[in-house]
Amino acid sequence: MANVTYGEVTQVIGAVVDIRFKPGELPDLMNAITIRSSEQDAGFTAVAEIDVMLEAMQLLGNDVVRCVALQPTDGISRGMKAVNTGAAIKIPVGEGCLGRILNVLGQPVDEAGPVNASDYWEIHRKPPALVEQLPATQQLETGIKVADLICPYAKGGKIGLFGGAGVGKTVIIQELIRNIAYEHGGYSVFTGVGERTREGNDLWGEMTESGVIDKCALIFGQMNEPPGARLRVGLTGMTVAEYFRDFSGLDVLIFIDNIFRFAQAGNEVSALLGRMPSAVGYQPTLATDMGYLQERITSTRKGSITSAQAVYVPADDLTDPAPATTFAHLDATTVLSRAISELGIYPAVDPLDSTSRILDPQVVGDKHYDTARGVQKILQRYKELQDIIAILGMDELSDEDKLIVARARKIQRFLSQPFHVAEQFTGSPGIYVPTSETVESFSQVLAGKHDNLSEDSFYMVGNIDTAVAKAKRLEA
């Protein structure tokens, strides 16, 4: 039984609440503390019902604890009674979370009744011990050609999705959730950190329509929430994912949108606690906070957690402390380009900017590595030739360069792919392409086996066989 103690509110400054406890009854750091109307002394009156969860962050001395609220502090006043629960925040975990929208405290916000929880876990958990972690590096097949070929994702790794508004980050996220659910039997957890409420609602609606909602848990800490909630919602999502990994033995995918807002929330909390700011005004514990979350994303012998994190880059400055700290943890970066989306090529992934740690012959094999580098080499040469083409035209190019341009344009279109979750918009059925077929298809294009096919044959198809079939249809 947790050691429950009682304190009294002495100060309220926005999201920060100071509480004095009796000597010897101080809560541990990270303990959950509640302030509720129902726990007050007789005679207490309030305009509205108060039910606020806080987390102990600092021990100030003189038996006073400084706490950060995870919910709005409206209605809290000096002299109110606070209850130390004797444990960290606990949330429901298990398959009952699938198809539901939860907040940072694990409370349902979708008006669909209580969560049918398998268990309740604390959100503050240690990462797996080194002996439990899976040493081998494996590729997680996504069925998305450009990702599997150019920037393969590591099972249990961390992927950064970089891109502006409207270039297709959400569609890639939905397709990954769908492919993991249908092709691998896995579950996904979507964690909205500082997410716009409208975007979260749109995502839920689209996932319900596309039929993947039953394989996904949605955890939201919207941008109107106090900074404490936005700082901890990532841990709530991780805890839900860890249960599936450790108890169901599954390969779980967790999405964090946006990891920058996680750092931003830590910045706000740090300032509220009175800490001296560090570089560019960020909290001095930025690297520690980031590592605390990221180190829990890993493969074990039971299962894996793979994360895809949207990364906002302030003022396009990659040296800003928030994205710079995130880079240190990423295994793969998928860069979405507006220039490619303007060509109508989706997913609009830039194959020259996207990278992966496991694009290595010892991991993916020589054929995969050589094919990926060959694709990048041709696309890079095409990029260099575009200025010449724009000024002088194609006729001034050598025969070799003309061939490179022709193949590059085919490869560029071949990197496009119809998605299952976008069927209602494109009218084309989605296609899942295994990595082996992707590598073989691009290998044949590089070898010149399909130089006779038109560029249109390669647009929005799956493997090379579907491109050949499309070419025959176009000729007919």
Swiss-Prot record:
Pfam family name, one: ATP-synt_VA_C
Chief location of this protein within or outside the cell: membrane
Binding-site residues, ATP: 163-170
E.C. number: 7.1.2.2
InterPro entries: AAA+_ATPase, ATP-synt_VA_C, ATP_synth_F1_bsu, ATPase_a/bsu_AS, ATPase_alpha/beta_chains, ATPase_F1/V1/A1_a/bsu_N, ATPase_F1/V1/A1_a/bsu_N_sf, ATPase_F1/V1/A1_a/bsu_nucl-bd
Keywords: ATP synthesis, ATP-binding, Cell membrane, CF(1), Hydrogen ion transport, Ion transport, Membrane, Nucleotide-binding, Translocase, Transport
Membrane topology, record value: Peripheral membrane protein
GO molecular function, one term: ATP binding
CDD domains: ATP-synt_F1_beta_C, ATP-synt_F1_beta_N, F1-ATPase_beta_CD
Origin: domain of life: Bacteria
Record's subcellular location: Cell membrane
PROSITE patterns, A to Z: ATPASE_ALPHA_BETA
Reactions this protein catalyses: ATP + H2O + 4 H(+)(in) = ADP + phosphate + 5 H(+)(out)
Gene Ontology CC annotations of this record: plasma membrane; proton-transporting ATP synthase complex
Coiled-coil stretches: none
Entry keyword Kinase: no
Quaternary structure, from the entry: F-type ATPases have 2 components, CF(1) - the catalytic core - and CF(0) - the membrane proton channel. CF(1) has five subunits: alpha(3), beta(3), gamma(1), delta(1), epsilon(1). CF(0) has three main subunits: a(1), b(2) and c(9-12). The alpha and beta chains form an alternating ring which encloses part of the gamma chain. CF(1) is attached to CF(0) by a central stalk formed by the gamma and epsilon chains, while a peripheral stalk is formed by the delta and b chains.
NCBIfam families attached to this UniProt entry: atpD (TIGR01039)
Family, as annotated: Belongs to the ATPase alpha/beta chains family.
Protein task: Produces ATP from ADP in the presence of a proton gradient across the membrane. The catalytic sites are hosted primarily by the beta subunits.
Name used for this protein in its record: ATP synthase subunit beta
Gene, per the UniProt record: atpD
